[in-house]
Amino acid sequence: MILESVAEHLLFKNDINYQNVFSILSDILEKKIDYSDIYFQSIIHESWILENSIIKEGTYNINQGVGVRIVLGDKTSFSYSNDITFNSLISSSKLAMSILDVKAITKNVCPLTTTRTKPIYTSCNPLTSIDTQKKLEILNRINCVAKNYDHRVVSVNAELSSSYDEVLIATSDGNLAADIRPLIRLSINVLVNDKGKFERGVSGGGSRSGYSFFLNKHKSGKILAEYYACEAARIALINLSAQEAPSGTFPVVLGSGWPGVLLHEAVGHGLEGDFNRQGTSVFANKIGRQVASELCTIVDDGTLKDRRGSLTIDDEGTPGQYNILIKNGILKKYLQDKTNARLMEMDLTGNGRRESYAHLPLPRMTNTYMLSGPFNPKEIICSIDYGIYALNFSGGQVDITSGKFVFSTSEAYLIKQGKIGKSIKNVTLIGSGIDVMKEISMVGNDLKIDEGVGICVKNGQSIPVGVGQPTIKLNNLTVGGTI
Protein backbone atom coordinates (compact mmCIF):
# COMPACT_ATOMS: atom_id res chain seq x y z
CA MET A 1 0.00 0.00 0.00
CA ILE A 2 1.12 3.57 -0.74
CA LEU A 3 0.83 4.88 2.83
CA GLU A 4 2.81 2.03 4.36
CA SER A 5 5.52 2.27 1.70
CA VAL A 6 5.95 6.04 2.08
CA ALA A 7 5.77 5.93 5.88
CA GLU A 8 8.50 3.28 5.92
CA HIS A 9 10.79 5.50 3.85
CA LEU A 10 9.99 8.93 5.31
CA LEU A 11 9.14 8.09 8.93
CA PHE A 12 10.17 4.68 10.21
CA LYS A 13 13.66 4.66 8.65
CA ASN A 14 14.25 8.00 10.35
CA ASP A 15 13.08 6.66 13.74
CA ILE A 16 9.80 8.58 13.61
CA ASN A 17 6.48 6.84 14.24
CA TYR A 18 2.86 7.90 13.90
CA GLN A 19 2.63 8.69 17.61
CA ASN A 20 5.56 11.11 17.29
CA VAL A 21 3.74 12.97 14.53
CA PHE A 22 0.51 12.96 16.55
CA SER A 23 2.32 14.37 19.59
CA ILE A 24 3.79 17.26 17.57
CA LEU A 25 0.34 18.18 16.27
CA SER A 26 -1.07 17.88 19.81
CA ASP A 27 1.57 20.27 21.14
CA ILE A 28 0.75 22.77 18.40
CA LEU A 29 -2.97 22.52 19.15
CA GLU A 30 -2.38 23.58 22.72
CA LYS A 31 -2.18 27.01 21.14
CA LYS A 32 -5.09 29.05 19.83
CA ILE A 33 -4.88 28.19 16.13
CA ASP A 34 -7.23 27.15 13.34
CA TYR A 35 -5.18 24.53 11.57
CA SER A 36 -1.78 22.89 11.32
CA ASP A 37 -0.12 20.31 9.11
CA ILE A 38 3.18 18.49 8.73
CA TYR A 39 4.43 17.72 5.23
CA PHE A 40 7.15 15.11 4.66
CA GLN A 41 8.76 14.72 1.24
CA SER A 42 11.53 12.89 -0.57
CA ILE A 43 12.09 13.53 -4.27
CA ILE A 44 14.67 12.02 -6.61
CA HIS A 45 15.31 13.77 -9.94
CA GLU A 46 17.46 13.06 -12.97
CA SER A 47 18.05 14.86 -16.24
CA TRP A 48 19.91 13.99 -19.46
CA ILE A 49 20.75 16.78 -21.92
CA LEU A 50 21.68 16.49 -25.60
CA GLU A 51 23.26 19.55 -27.25
CA ASN A 52 24.38 19.74 -30.86
CA SER A 53 24.25 15.96 -31.31
CA ILE A 54 26.28 15.28 -28.15
CA ILE A 55 24.97 14.12 -24.79
CA LYS A 56 26.65 16.78 -22.69
CA GLU A 57 25.14 16.51 -19.26
CA GLY A 58 23.56 14.07 -16.85
CA THR A 59 22.40 15.10 -13.38
CA TYR A 60 20.99 13.20 -10.43
CA ASN A 61 19.87 14.69 -7.13
CA ILE A 62 17.89 13.83 -4.02
CA ASN A 63 16.02 16.37 -1.94
CA GLN A 64 14.07 15.58 1.20
CA GLY A 65 12.72 17.35 4.22
CA VAL A 66 9.73 18.29 6.35
CA GLY A 67 7.66 21.46 6.64
CA VAL A 68 5.46 22.51 9.56
CA ARG A 69 2.64 24.99 8.94
CA ILE A 70 0.40 26.73 11.47
CA VAL A 71 -2.63 28.81 10.44
CA LEU A 72 -4.62 31.32 12.48
CA GLY A 73 -7.20 33.36 10.59
CA ASP A 74 -5.46 34.63 7.48
CA LYS A 75 -2.02 34.47 9.11
CA THR A 76 0.38 31.58 8.53
CA SER A 77 3.66 30.63 10.13
CA PHE A 78 5.92 28.09 8.49
CA SER A 79 9.19 26.38 9.24
CA TYR A 80 11.01 23.59 7.41
CA SER A 81 14.09 21.43 7.64
CA ASN A 82 15.96 19.20 5.18
CA ASP A 83 16.71 16.85 8.08
CA ILE A 84 13.92 14.33 8.68
CA THR A 85 14.42 13.43 12.35
CA PHE A 86 12.22 13.72 15.41
CA ASN A 87 14.49 16.41 16.86
CA SER A 88 14.32 18.55 13.71
CA LEU A 89 10.56 18.05 13.67
CA ILE A 90 10.34 19.38 17.23
CA SER A 91 12.60 22.32 16.36
CA SER A 92 10.58 23.20 13.26
CA SER A 93 7.28 23.08 15.14
CA LYS A 94 8.63 25.29 17.96
CA LEU A 95 9.97 27.80 15.45
CA ALA A 96 6.64 27.90 13.61
CA MET A 97 4.81 28.48 16.90
CA SER A 98 7.18 31.26 17.90
CA ILE A 99 6.70 33.03 14.57
CA LEU A 100 2.92 33.17 15.00
CA ASP A 101 3.19 34.05 18.73
CA VAL A 102 -0.15 32.47 19.63
CA LYS A 103 -1.72 32.11 23.06
CA ALA A 104 -2.30 28.85 24.89
CA ILE A 105 -5.72 27.22 24.81
CA THR A 106 -7.08 23.75 25.55
CA LYS A 107 -7.76 21.96 22.26
CA ASN A 108 -7.34 18.33 21.25
CA VAL A 109 -6.05 17.09 17.92
CA CYS A 110 -8.40 14.76 16.07
CA PRO A 111 -7.20 11.14 15.99
CA LEU A 112 -5.21 10.57 12.80
CA THR A 113 -7.36 8.75 10.25
CA THR A 114 -5.77 7.44 7.08
CA THR A 115 -7.03 8.67 3.73
CA ARG A 116 -6.72 5.94 1.12
CA THR A 117 -7.59 7.26 -2.31
CA LYS A 118 -7.31 4.97 -5.32
CA PRO A 119 -4.11 5.96 -7.20
CA ILE A 120 -4.62 7.44 -10.66
CA TYR A 121 -1.04 6.78 -11.77
CA THR A 122 1.60 4.14 -11.24
CA SER A 123 3.88 4.08 -8.21
CA CYS A 124 6.83 2.86 -10.30
CA ASN A 125 10.10 4.75 -10.17
CA PRO A 126 10.72 6.16 -13.68
CA LEU A 127 14.44 6.57 -12.98
CA THR A 128 14.79 2.77 -12.79
CA SER A 129 12.09 1.91 -15.35
CA ILE A 130 14.71 1.50 -18.10
CA ASP A 131 18.49 1.35 -17.94
CA THR A 132 20.79 4.30 -18.63
CA GLN A 133 21.81 3.06 -22.07
CA LYS A 134 18.19 3.05 -23.25
CA LYS A 135 17.72 6.61 -21.99
CA LEU A 136 20.71 7.73 -24.01
CA GLU A 137 19.42 5.78 -27.01
CA ILE A 138 16.17 7.78 -26.87
CA LEU A 139 18.12 11.04 -27.07
CA ASN A 140 20.36 9.78 -29.88
CA ARG A 141 17.33 8.54 -31.77
CA ILE A 142 15.71 11.98 -31.46
CA ASN A 143 18.85 13.61 -32.81
CA CYS A 144 19.02 11.22 -35.77
CA VAL A 145 15.33 11.55 -36.69
CA ALA A 146 15.36 15.35 -36.48
CA LYS A 147 18.58 15.67 -38.48
CA ASN A 148 17.21 13.35 -41.19
CA TYR A 149 13.89 15.20 -41.35
CA ASP A 150 15.36 17.91 -43.60
CA HIS A 151 18.82 19.01 -44.71
CA ARG A 152 18.15 22.48 -43.26
CA VAL A 153 18.12 21.15 -39.70
CA VAL A 154 21.41 22.36 -38.22
CA SER A 155 21.03 21.80 -34.49
CA VAL A 156 19.06 19.52 -32.19
CA ASN A 157 18.83 20.03 -28.43
CA ALA A 158 16.82 17.78 -26.14
CA GLU A 159 16.28 17.15 -22.45
CA LEU A 160 14.97 13.89 -20.99
CA SER A 161 14.08 14.08 -17.31
CA SER A 162 12.15 12.29 -14.60
CA SER A 163 11.37 12.47 -10.90
CA TYR A 164 10.09 10.14 -8.19
CA ASP A 165 8.26 12.07 -5.49
CA GLU A 166 7.05 10.60 -2.17
CA VAL A 167 4.93 12.75 0.16
CA LEU A 168 3.19 12.17 3.48
CA ILE A 169 0.84 14.70 5.08
CA ALA A 170 -0.48 14.71 8.66
CA THR A 171 -3.05 17.35 9.59
CA SER A 172 -4.58 18.72 12.78
CA ASP A 173 -8.05 17.84 11.52
CA GLY A 174 -7.06 14.19 11.71
CA ASN A 175 -5.99 13.34 8.17
CA LEU A 176 -3.01 11.12 7.40
CA ALA A 177 -2.37 10.64 3.68
CA ALA A 178 0.48 9.74 1.35
CA ASP A 179 1.21 9.71 -2.35
CA ILE A 180 3.89 8.50 -4.76
CA ARG A 181 4.16 10.71 -7.84
CA PRO A 182 6.26 9.67 -10.85
CA LEU A 183 6.84 12.25 -13.56
CA ILE A 184 8.65 12.18 -16.91
CA ARG A 185 9.23 14.93 -19.46
CA LEU A 186 10.88 15.24 -22.87
CA SER A 187 11.62 18.62 -24.46
CA ILE A 188 13.06 19.01 -27.97
CA ASN A 189 14.35 22.20 -29.62
CA VAL A 190 15.30 22.16 -33.32
CA LEU A 191 17.14 24.94 -35.17
CA VAL A 192 16.91 25.22 -38.96
CA ASN A 193 18.89 27.40 -41.37
CA ASP A 194 18.03 28.35 -44.93
CA LYS A 195 20.58 30.69 -46.53
CA GLY A 196 21.33 32.46 -43.28
CA LYS A 197 17.73 32.63 -42.10
CA PHE A 198 17.21 30.80 -38.81
CA GLU A 199 14.05 29.55 -37.10
CA ARG A 200 13.34 27.28 -34.13
CA GLY A 201 10.71 24.68 -33.42
CA VAL A 202 9.86 23.16 -30.06
CA SER A 203 7.96 20.00 -29.16
CA GLY A 204 7.79 17.39 -26.43
CA GLY A 205 5.62 15.43 -24.05
CA GLY A 206 5.36 13.78 -20.69
CA SER A 207 3.31 11.71 -18.29
CA ARG A 208 3.08 10.31 -14.77
CA SER A 209 4.62 7.00 -15.81
CA GLY A 210 7.92 5.37 -16.75
CA TYR A 211 10.26 6.23 -19.63
CA SER A 212 8.74 3.50 -21.81
CA PHE A 213 5.94 6.02 -22.43
CA PHE A 214 8.21 7.66 -25.01
CA LEU A 215 8.60 4.33 -26.82
CA ASN A 216 4.84 3.92 -27.30
CA LYS A 217 3.46 4.17 -30.83
CA HIS A 218 1.88 7.44 -31.92
CA LYS A 219 -1.06 7.34 -34.35
CA SER A 220 1.40 8.47 -37.04
CA GLY A 221 3.14 5.09 -36.74
CA LYS A 222 6.28 6.57 -35.18
CA ILE A 223 7.24 6.07 -31.57
CA LEU A 224 6.39 9.14 -29.48
CA ALA A 225 9.99 10.32 -29.10
CA GLU A 226 10.42 10.29 -32.89
CA TYR A 227 7.07 12.01 -33.42
CA TYR A 228 8.07 14.86 -31.10
CA ALA A 229 11.39 15.22 -32.95
CA CYS A 230 9.58 15.46 -36.28
CA GLU A 231 7.10 17.97 -34.85
CA ALA A 232 9.87 20.27 -33.63
CA ALA A 233 11.54 20.14 -37.06
CA ARG A 234 8.23 20.64 -38.87
CA ILE A 235 7.34 23.76 -36.86
CA ALA A 236 10.80 25.26 -37.40
CA LEU A 237 10.59 24.71 -41.16
CA ILE A 238 7.07 26.15 -41.37
CA ASN A 239 8.31 29.36 -39.77
CA LEU A 240 11.13 29.60 -42.32
CA SER A 241 8.59 30.30 -45.05
CA ALA A 242 6.07 32.15 -42.86
CA GLN A 243 5.14 35.71 -43.69
CA GLU A 244 4.66 38.50 -41.16
CA ALA A 245 1.29 38.50 -39.44
CA PRO A 246 -1.27 41.21 -40.19
CA SER A 247 -2.30 43.52 -37.37
CA GLY A 248 -5.80 44.55 -36.41
CA THR A 249 -8.92 42.91 -35.04
CA PHE A 250 -9.89 39.61 -36.63
CA PRO A 251 -11.82 36.41 -36.02
CA VAL A 252 -9.37 33.96 -34.48
CA VAL A 253 -9.53 30.16 -34.35
CA LEU A 254 -7.56 28.51 -31.56
CA GLY A 255 -6.54 24.91 -32.22
CA SER A 256 -7.19 22.02 -29.85
CA GLY A 257 -4.78 20.95 -27.11
CA TRP A 258 -1.86 23.20 -26.15
CA PRO A 259 -3.64 26.50 -27.08
CA GLY A 260 -5.57 25.80 -23.88
CA VAL A 261 -2.58 27.48 -22.21
CA LEU A 262 -4.32 30.77 -23.02
CA LEU A 263 -7.34 29.52 -21.07
CA HIS A 264 -5.05 28.47 -18.21
CA GLU A 265 -3.38 31.87 -17.98
CA ALA A 266 -6.17 34.28 -18.87
CA VAL A 267 -9.00 32.52 -17.03
CA GLY A 268 -7.68 29.74 -14.77
CA HIS A 269 -5.43 31.87 -12.57
CA GLY A 270 -8.27 34.32 -12.10
CA LEU A 271 -10.38 31.50 -10.62
CA GLU A 272 -7.88 30.62 -7.88
CA GLY A 273 -9.29 31.18 -4.41
CA ASP A 274 -6.63 33.48 -2.97
CA PHE A 275 -7.00 36.09 -5.71
CA ASN A 276 -10.79 36.06 -5.29
CA ARG A 277 -10.74 36.21 -1.49
CA GLN A 278 -8.44 39.22 -1.72
CA GLY A 279 -10.65 40.79 -4.39
CA THR A 280 -7.77 41.10 -6.86
CA SER A 281 -9.23 38.86 -9.59
CA VAL A 282 -11.48 40.08 -12.36
CA PHE A 283 -13.73 37.11 -11.42
CA ALA A 284 -14.13 38.14 -7.74
CA ASN A 285 -17.74 38.07 -6.46
CA LYS A 286 -19.03 36.74 -9.77
CA ILE A 287 -20.18 33.22 -8.78
CA GLY A 288 -23.59 32.61 -10.34
CA ARG A 289 -23.02 35.25 -13.01
CA GLN A 290 -22.33 34.82 -16.71
CA VAL A 291 -18.62 35.27 -17.39
CA ALA A 292 -18.33 33.46 -20.73
CA SER A 293 -20.27 32.37 -23.78
CA GLU A 294 -22.99 29.82 -23.00
CA LEU A 295 -21.03 27.41 -25.21
CA CYS A 296 -18.24 27.31 -22.61
CA THR A 297 -17.90 24.75 -19.86
CA ILE A 298 -14.49 24.80 -18.19
CA VAL A 299 -13.24 22.24 -15.68
CA ASP A 300 -10.19 21.64 -13.55
CA ASP A 301 -9.68 17.90 -13.37
CA GLY A 302 -7.07 16.38 -11.08
CA THR A 303 -8.35 12.86 -11.72
CA LEU A 304 -7.21 12.22 -15.31
CA LYS A 305 -5.22 8.99 -15.45
CA ASP A 306 -1.44 9.41 -15.81
CA ARG A 307 -1.71 13.09 -16.77
CA ARG A 308 1.00 15.55 -15.83
CA GLY A 309 -1.24 17.78 -13.72
CA SER A 310 -3.14 14.97 -12.01
CA LEU A 311 -3.01 14.31 -8.26
CA THR A 312 -4.31 11.36 -6.29
CA ILE A 313 -4.23 13.75 -3.32
CA ASP A 314 -3.22 17.39 -3.25
CA ASP A 315 -0.47 18.71 -0.99
CA GLU A 316 -2.88 19.11 1.93
CA GLY A 317 -4.15 15.52 1.73
CA THR A 318 -7.41 16.34 -0.04
CA PRO A 319 -8.29 13.83 -2.81
CA GLY A 320 -7.95 15.12 -6.38
CA GLN A 321 -11.30 16.17 -7.84
CA TYR A 322 -13.20 16.96 -11.02
CA ASN A 323 -14.34 20.56 -10.60
CA ILE A 324 -16.72 22.37 -12.94
CA LEU A 325 -15.57 25.99 -12.77
CA ILE A 326 -17.71 27.53 -15.50
CA LYS A 327 -20.84 25.76 -16.80
CA ASN A 328 -22.57 27.02 -19.93
CA GLY A 329 -20.91 30.37 -19.33
CA ILE A 330 -21.96 30.67 -15.66
CA LEU A 331 -19.23 30.86 -12.99
CA LYS A 332 -19.77 27.99 -10.53
CA LYS A 333 -16.78 27.86 -8.18
CA TYR A 334 -13.21 28.86 -7.41
CA LEU A 335 -10.19 26.61 -6.94
CA GLN A 336 -9.43 26.26 -3.23
CA ASP A 337 -6.81 25.22 -0.74
CA LYS A 338 -7.76 24.73 2.92
CA THR A 339 -6.95 28.24 4.10
CA ASN A 340 -8.91 30.10 1.44
CA ALA A 341 -11.80 27.62 1.48
CA ARG A 342 -12.16 28.12 5.25
CA LEU A 343 -11.96 31.91 5.05
CA MET A 344 -14.42 32.04 2.13
CA GLU A 345 -16.67 29.35 3.68
CA MET A 346 -16.49 27.27 0.51
CA ASP A 347 -15.90 23.58 -0.21
CA LEU A 348 -12.45 22.12 -0.80
CA THR A 349 -11.61 21.35 -4.43
CA GLY A 350 -8.32 19.41 -4.10
CA ASN A 351 -6.17 22.27 -5.38
CA GLY A 352 -3.82 22.96 -2.45
CA ARG A 353 -0.42 22.57 -4.14
CA ARG A 354 3.19 23.36 -3.29
CA GLU A 355 6.49 22.99 -5.09
CA SER A 356 8.13 21.18 -2.17
CA TYR A 357 8.29 20.74 1.60
CA ALA A 358 10.09 24.12 1.70
CA HIS A 359 7.09 25.98 0.24
CA LEU A 360 3.61 26.91 1.47
CA PRO A 361 0.60 25.43 -0.35
CA LEU A 362 -1.44 27.72 -2.59
CA PRO A 363 -4.63 27.22 -4.61
CA ARG A 364 -3.32 26.03 -7.98
CA MET A 365 -4.65 24.37 -11.12
CA THR A 366 -4.20 20.69 -12.05
CA ASN A 367 -5.48 19.85 -15.57
CA THR A 368 -7.63 22.76 -16.76
CA TYR A 369 -9.60 22.49 -19.99
CA MET A 370 -12.76 23.38 -21.87
CA LEU A 371 -15.23 20.63 -22.71
CA SER A 372 -16.13 19.76 -26.31
CA GLY A 373 -18.94 21.50 -28.16
CA PRO A 374 -21.13 20.57 -31.14
CA PHE A 375 -19.06 21.78 -34.11
CA ASN A 376 -16.74 19.96 -36.47
CA PRO A 377 -13.41 21.84 -36.62
CA LYS A 378 -13.77 22.11 -40.41
CA GLU A 379 -17.09 23.93 -39.92
CA ILE A 380 -15.33 26.43 -37.70
CA ILE A 381 -12.63 27.17 -40.29
CA CYS A 382 -15.22 27.38 -43.07
CA SER A 383 -17.20 29.99 -41.12
CA ILE A 384 -14.40 32.57 -41.42
CA ASP A 385 -13.82 34.72 -44.50
CA TYR A 386 -10.58 36.27 -43.24
CA GLY A 387 -8.91 35.53 -39.92
CA ILE A 388 -6.16 33.81 -37.97
CA TYR A 389 -5.69 30.14 -37.09
CA ALA A 390 -3.42 29.80 -34.02
CA LEU A 391 -2.27 26.21 -33.65
CA ASN A 392 0.59 26.45 -31.12
CA PHE A 393 1.77 28.98 -28.55
CA SER A 394 5.27 29.85 -27.40
CA GLY A 395 4.59 32.09 -24.42
CA GLY A 396 2.59 34.89 -22.89
CA GLN A 397 1.81 37.19 -20.00
CA VAL A 398 -1.37 37.91 -18.02
CA ASP A 399 -2.41 40.42 -15.37
CA ILE A 400 -4.62 38.64 -12.82
CA THR A 401 -6.34 41.81 -11.60
CA SER A 402 -7.50 43.03 -15.01
CA GLY A 403 -7.46 39.70 -16.84
CA LYS A 404 -5.56 41.31 -19.72
CA PHE A 405 -3.17 39.04 -21.62
CA VAL A 406 -0.58 39.04 -24.38
CA PHE A 407 0.29 35.73 -26.09
CA SER A 408 2.62 34.86 -28.95
CA THR A 409 2.20 31.89 -31.29
CA SER A 410 4.80 29.42 -32.53
CA GLU A 411 2.59 28.13 -35.36
CA ALA A 412 -0.18 30.10 -37.02
CA TYR A 413 -1.88 30.48 -40.40
CA LEU A 414 -4.10 32.90 -42.27
CA ILE A 415 -7.66 31.83 -42.97
CA LYS A 416 -9.03 33.06 -46.29
CA GLN A 417 -12.50 32.30 -47.63
CA GLY A 418 -12.98 29.43 -45.24
CA LYS A 419 -9.67 27.73 -45.97
CA ILE A 420 -6.35 27.52 -44.12
CA GLY A 421 -3.81 29.53 -46.07
CA LYS A 422 -0.19 30.60 -45.69
CA SER A 423 1.75 30.29 -42.47
CA ILE A 424 2.38 33.51 -40.55
CA LYS A 425 4.80 34.37 -37.76
CA ASN A 426 5.19 36.93 -34.99
CA VAL A 427 1.49 36.62 -34.19
CA THR A 428 0.62 38.31 -30.91
CA LEU A 429 -2.87 37.90 -29.46
CA ILE A 430 -4.00 40.68 -27.12
CA GLY A 431 -7.14 40.76 -25.02
CA SER A 432 -8.89 40.32 -21.70
CA GLY A 433 -9.81 36.88 -20.41
CA ILE A 434 -13.35 37.72 -19.35
CA ASP A 435 -14.05 39.61 -22.62
CA VAL A 436 -12.53 36.94 -24.85
CA MET A 437 -14.60 34.21 -23.20
CA LYS A 438 -17.73 36.06 -24.29
CA GLU A 439 -16.41 36.25 -27.86
CA ILE A 440 -16.49 32.45 -28.26
CA SER A 441 -19.13 31.64 -30.87
CA MET A 442 -18.19 28.08 -31.89
CA VAL A 443 -16.71 25.21 -29.87
CA GLY A 444 -15.38 22.12 -31.63
CA ASN A 445 -16.03 18.46 -30.85
CA ASP A 446 -12.31 17.64 -30.76
CA LEU A 447 -11.23 18.15 -27.14
CA LYS A 448 -7.55 17.40 -26.68
CA ILE A 449 -5.31 17.60 -23.62
CA ASP A 450 -1.77 18.85 -24.20
CA GLU A 451 1.15 16.44 -24.67
CA GLY A 452 2.30 16.75 -21.06
CA VAL A 453 4.92 19.49 -20.79
CA GLY A 454 3.12 22.25 -18.87
CA ILE A 455 4.87 24.07 -16.03
CA CYS A 456 3.04 26.74 -14.05
CA VAL A 457 4.79 29.37 -11.92
CA LYS A 458 3.03 31.31 -9.15
CA ASN A 459 4.69 33.20 -6.30
CA GLY A 460 7.98 31.68 -7.41
CA GLN A 461 6.70 28.09 -7.12
CA SER A 462 6.86 25.80 -10.18
CA ILE A 463 4.48 22.85 -10.48
CA PRO A 464 3.44 20.48 -13.31
CA VAL A 465 0.06 21.18 -14.91
CA GLY A 466 -2.05 20.12 -17.87
CA VAL A 467 -4.09 22.27 -20.26
CA GLY A 468 -6.51 21.52 -23.05
CA GLN A 469 -9.46 22.54 -25.17
CA PRO A 470 -11.26 21.74 -28.41
CA THR A 471 -10.95 23.99 -31.46
CA ILE A 472 -12.72 27.27 -30.67
CA LYS A 473 -13.70 30.37 -32.62
CA LEU A 474 -13.35 33.89 -31.22
CA ASN A 475 -15.42 36.41 -33.15
CA ASN A 476 -12.96 39.23 -32.53
CA LEU A 477 -9.48 39.40 -31.05
CA THR A 478 -6.73 41.99 -31.39
CA VAL A 479 -3.68 40.78 -33.29
CA GLY A 480 -0.56 42.89 -32.82
CA GLY A 481 3.24 42.84 -33.02
CA THR A 482 5.75 40.63 -31.24
CA ILE A 483 6.21 40.39 -27.47
UniProtKB/Swiss-Prot annotation:
Keyword Iron appears in the UniProt entry: no
Keywords annotated in UniProt: Hydrolase, Metalloprotease, Protease
InterPro entries noted in UniProt: Metalloprtase-TldD/E_C, Metalloprtase-TldD/E_cen_dom, Metalloprtase-TldD/E_N, Peptidase_U62_metallo, TldD, TldD/PmbA_N, TldD/PmbA_sf
Pfam families linked to this entry: PmbA_TldD_1st, PmbA_TldD_2nd, PmbA_TldD_3rd
Enzyme class: hydrolase
EC number, as in UniProt: 3.4.-.-
A biological-process GO annotation: proteolysis
Origin superkingdom: Bacteria
Molecular function per GO: metallopeptidase activity
SUPFAM superfamilies: Putative modulator of DNA gyrase, PmbA/TldD
GO cellular component, one term: cytosol
Family per record: Belongs to the peptidase U62 family.
NCBIfam families per the UniProt record, alphabetical: PRK10735.1
Function: Probable metalloprotease.
Name listed for the protein in its UniProt record: Metalloprotease TldD homolog
Species: Buchnera aphidicola subsp. Baizongia pistaciae (strain Bp)
